[in-house]
Amino acid sequence: MARLSGVERPDDSGLRERKARAVEEPVKQPVESADGAAAAAQAKKKTIGRTPDGTAFTVPHTRDMVSQLLSPSEPKNLSDILVLSIIGLHIVLLYLLPSFLRIPIFAVLFLSWRAAYNIGIGWLLHMQSNHSTMVLWARQTKIFVNPATGDNPHPQLYSFIKRELETKIPEDYSFEDAPIEYNTWLVFRRVVDLILMCDFTSYCLFAIACGSRPAEENFLVLILRWVVGLGLVLFNLWVKLDAHRVVKDFAWYWGDFFYLVDQELTFDGVFEMAPHPMYSVGYAGYYGISLMAASYKVLFISILAHAAQFAFLVLVENPHIEKTYNAPPPRKRTIESHAGLAGEEKSSRRPSDSSEMVPPPSPVALPSSTHNLVGVKNLDLHRITDSSIILIQVLFFALTMLTPSTPIYQFFFVLNAAIWRLWYSVGIGYILNCQSHRREWTRHFVKFGETKEEAWNQWKGTYHLSMTLCYASFIAAAWKMYTLPENWGYGLAILKHVLGAGLIALQIWTSVSIYDSLGEFGWFFGDFFFDEAPKLTYSGIYRFLNNPERVLGLAGVWGAALITSSRAMIFLALLSHTLGIAFIQLVERPHMQKLYGRGLRQDAGLVRSIKRSLPPSFKQLHGSVDRILDESIEFIEEVLDTARPKLAAGVTTFVKDTSELFHKYPARITITRIEPDLAGYDMNDYSINVDTSDCITIRDGAEDKSEVLVFEYGSPIKVNWTAPLNHSKRDWVGLYMIGQNPSREVTNVSSWGRWVATNHGSFDSVLSEKGLIASDVVVSKPGTSNTSKKPSVKSGSGKKSSTSTSSHEVASGQMVFSGDKLWWTQGVFEFRYHHNGKHNVMATSRPFEIRIPKFDDGQIPSHVSSNGNGFMTTAIEQALLPIVQNCFDRDPEISPQTAEEPFGCETEGDLKYAKRVVYAVHQMFGIEFATEVVRADGNVQNLAWRICNAKKVLAPYSMRKSNGASTPTGESEEMK
């Protein structure tokens, strides 16, 4: 049975998996009669949409793309005629082109439309999700503003769009009254219609151009090929229709990138069968068409298009879903007692999902997940498990490459793979079975005075090493048994390699999905070692399958057997699959039934969908087969219980992960845009000054002649600027490290998102206005002014050809740099004022320093280190709290107000707050922690306790000075 973990909740695993339920908020209408009551009841079924600013509106009913374009009963407008005309041109082109040009031309056409889909639409949606770019374009161009107001510079375009949209939506829609977000989405829909229809049309025409019948094909194979191909196409059609039935046009056209609807997330139909059905099984028709065309060209271009669609899903849709629907839960304002926390831990199967962990000195119910084992990113050569695996992999590789592929060596490699598979399934299964019944693994370590956490860590190492050796030996055997085809065009050589690679990719994806759903705890069968009142969840791949590893999790071994076409590899694949199923039935299933009882789900989503479509006679047959299997399994278990040998296995628990230096040296290759003519701008009117109200001013130099502005790490920095009244509305201010830009007149290094616009609505990104406080406030500037107009910039001032002592008016503004717009590292920085969206520097600020104060051990009484840690811990808490608050952007929703208050939650993929804290702790105390440690500690009090103990362990090395040049990230991460 599946190792399940966590608390059950909906799995929002696909953008187009959101079904709109009738909203309970009625549209207010007077009800004066029976007709009025019926109208009110109908109003309750209306879908209510909400824009990002909270505006509520009734979402009109719209028709799907195919019905709009092809149904004669649907009204047609100019955009429909345009789409149909372009489709018709594609068809005409197929018949006009000579035969030798059809395939390359339509291959280019299809790839162009596919790029417009995945890259073009993907970029638009990415920008809309993060910056509301399309809505900002609509606001800037004012295309939805009524021309009667005199503010619309495009009245003809307004009339055209209004006519186009109102023709398509006759009910519940008013172009003038609809929110700008909804109108923008409707225009975006028309662009999507054009791209999707041309994408599919060009693909079908390419398949027609490539279609042929192999010369050696007999009639039976021809019939079979077309029957299977048509079946896949019809299945694809059903998937698309059922998906549209569930999600409607709102999710089909990515509506929640523009607005949200008042609805619940529900899953039924095709969304119970497979994850992301629109992008997984929803592309089965591509392979059906490839089969009917009997063309490898169509197959390969189908695989390429399918891979591009998955990239679109991963890079565009999934991040938006996480941000929109899987926001972290609200933070608890007061920390709970240890007992309450322990109880909460007992009810959670995924300790890594909670940041409110028990303080380090207290015992925990479930193991800490601060130092995971699975994955390349968790590779730690200081651990003997990881170093042993690397050495063994090198040994396997050397033996495989250096030995000949003679029959005797092939035999030994296959035998080695079979032995490791037996150990991985039978040996590991025996250990887990003993652990389930008698806790033998844990008892062994307790006997020698170890804890069950130590037993758990040793078990993880044993299982991880066994799994790695099992698959390494299998790959080595496959390599020995494989021979390159002499003629790739003969027989099914290419097809076997393609299908085999697909099966291997399927197993890799399944394993990654299982790990994402279970976490480290479930992956290593944690409920065999910690069984305190667990709860089940069926998220991720487990929403569709109870035991994905039973079939999909072993697809790769059959892929290797298919590629090698070797009887020995078929034997290994059969052995692996048989032992894998036996492991599930004889080890996992009994333990899960004992632990969870009736809490186990009988049928997964895919099984439920299939059962609903079966006639009653088949359902009865299925029940009889299940009973026979259950009785057979019980008999086998009784036989095994009567004779079970005892095995003893133990593994002892060796160069630190390489630190990422990407952000230490930012990219210096950028495209610098220069404004060629700056005539008409008085350079003396440009200035930029740092607000010194929050800075720490210290004397610089022995003679104390100058002052250095010093800001605390992470504290917001206010900037005041002035510019001529005629300055460009697209001016902007960027934050840079001193020394990055050799020129004072031109900036040639990217700001990495650390910039703020001087005016609202000037750039296609809402983030550009984040931090903007005031702009274009007219003030009087006393003193001299430059009348020459000739630009010359040096440190914020220009050359003067003539002067005047009279004051004059200038524009001024204020902005604040905070959060992701700071550098989050120590160093000396400056602000630069740029002109008209380009990189001409009009003014620079005074340099200032970002500094993290070192914790002074000298302020701790000498007796503390020997008699106790209480005073030192308190001192560390007091020094650390304000820095941690800065690291959390001083946001009251996530930033702790006291040392005991827990940190706010952040998503698994975004650990920026924890990385900031890690960097600050490293610079303050000379101690480097992993981000997982910060998340596990959960508050300043626990973190201070850990720092205090680390200082004792590492003394006198804990205060080694760092150069402070690196950014506070353990992984490459671009600051937005």
Curated annotation (Swiss-Prot):
Lumenal topological intervals: 1-80, 126-190, 240-272, 317-388, 432-464, 509-567
Known EC number: 2.1.1.17
Major subcellular location class: endoplasmic reticulum
Keyword Transferase: yes
Biased composition (Low complexity): 787-807
Region span, Disordered: 1-36, 326-366, 780-810
Root EC class: transferase
Pathway given in the UniProt record: Phospholipid metabolism; phosphatidylcholine biosynthesis
Keyword terms, alphabetized: Endoplasmic reticulum, Lipid biosynthesis, Lipid metabolism, Membrane, Methyltransferase, Phospholipid biosynthesis, Phospholipid metabolism, S-adenosyl-L-methionine, Transferase, Transmembrane, Transmembrane helix
Any one GO CC term of the record: endoplasmic reticulum membrane
Sequence ranges of Basic and acidic residues compositional bias: 1-27, 343-353
UniProt-listed HAMAP family: PEMT (MF_03217)
Protein name per the record: Phosphatidylethanolamine N-methyltransferase
Organism expressing this protein natively: Trichophyton verrucosum (strain HKI 0517)
Underlying gene: CHO2
